Every structure is written in structure tokens, then in C-alpha cells.
Amino acid sequence: TEELEKMLAFWTGAGLKQVVVIHYDDEVGKQNLASVVDYLSKQGKQPKAISLQRNAKVDAKQIDELLKLKPDVLINTVLSGPAAEISRQISSRGLTVPMSSLSFVGAQQYIVAAGESGAGVSIAQVVPSATAQIPIVRECAKVLQDAGVTAPMNSTHLEACIGAKVLTEAMRRTKKPGNPEGLLNAMRNLGSYDTGGFIVSYGATKQHGSKFVELAMVSREGRLRY
């Protein structure tokens, strides 16, 4: 919800009116659509939407249907494959439609799949930039290097690394090692934990860890610009 609100606040603040949501035709997809509807209804606005089947290819007919909705901006909640295909097909028609995607899209996967068509798309990020000058970024970069990974660290790597560090800390605090319920209780009682310049917080009613959200734009060089 925080990611969707960040994207919608940006675009509605820029004066764009017709929001079109791209979502999966399943429970999670419908929840994403409902979040957008709820946010925009408070401004007296109503989004339009197009639903996709999971693991199905995006065809030209669906792009036709999407463009008939005359979007000012696309809010994407599907994975990198279909999102990239939509970007490529819109671009191949000589059109440009602003798009913002949930972090769920997988930034690096989208960038690779979309190619030049991905330039200008903004993607929500739930961790700091992979080039930020903070301890957790340096620590995770070293872990990847020590593991033999030669590619530059990206946001997906960093998010996984932070998750692993949080899980390791919870395991360290578990009173009964190897006990799933004990690990769950340790996570629930973790409280505020500084991973190294990036603080997460867990509790009985706090299970997301962080509300950090930034929008990063894909550059022409295929990099995320914060």
C-alpha cells in the first residue's frame, strides 16, 4: 500500500488524471486494484484497469484494449515479463505512456527484459540505493564479492541481503534454536534493529519491517536513478 500511495501521490501531484492499473486477475491483483481505487476515491477520481492472467503472454489485442482506456499514467503491479512486454509494444507503436511499477516487478529483471523501452519507467524501491554510502550496502557488496558474484550489486541483491541479516539476527535471539515457533516469536519481538544504516522494526502489529519507499527511474543506460 505504501508503494502504491507513493506512486499515486507523485503522479496526481503532477496533474495526471487518468490512472490505469495493470494487475493480475487473482486475489492479490484485485487487492492492488482496490488499494488504488480507495486512494483515488478520496480525491474524487476513479481509475480504469486491465487484468492479466499469470504466466500468460501479453498480445497485441490486450495492448489495444489498454490504449483504448487513454491512460495518462500506468500503475503496474505485475511481474517483469509482462510489464516489459507492455513497454516494448507501446514503444513499438511510437507512443510514450508514463509507467510506475511496484518493487514486486523486479527492477533488474525488468530493465533487462524491456531494453531501451524501459527508459523513463519508475520503479518503487523498498531498500536504499545499492550505491548508497552506508554500512549495510558495503557489507552486502562484500558478501556478494566473496561469493564470486562479479555483476554489480542491485536492489534485488540488497533486499535479499538485508532480509538474510534480519533473519540471522532473529535466529540468534531464538531461545529454542531450530524451533519454527521460537523463530517466529523472535521475529515478532525483534523491535527496532539497525542493519547498518537501514533500520527495520518488527512487533506484534508490525510485520512488514519497514515503510521505506522511494521511486527510482530507469535511465537510458539501464540504471536506476534515485
What are these regions (language model features)?
Residues 87-161, 218, 222-225:
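Extracellular/periplasmic periplasmic-binding protein-like sensory domains
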Residues 47-51, 121-123, 215:
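Conserved beta-strand scaffold positions in the cores of enzyme catalytic domains, especially
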Residues 1-94, 130-138:
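Extracellular/periplasmic Venus flytrap/periplasmic-binding protein
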Residues 16, 118, 210-212:
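A structure-centric signal for secondary-structure junctions around beta-strands
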Residues 10-14, 35-43, 65, 69, ...:
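Structured segments of extracytoplasmic/periplasmic soluble domains
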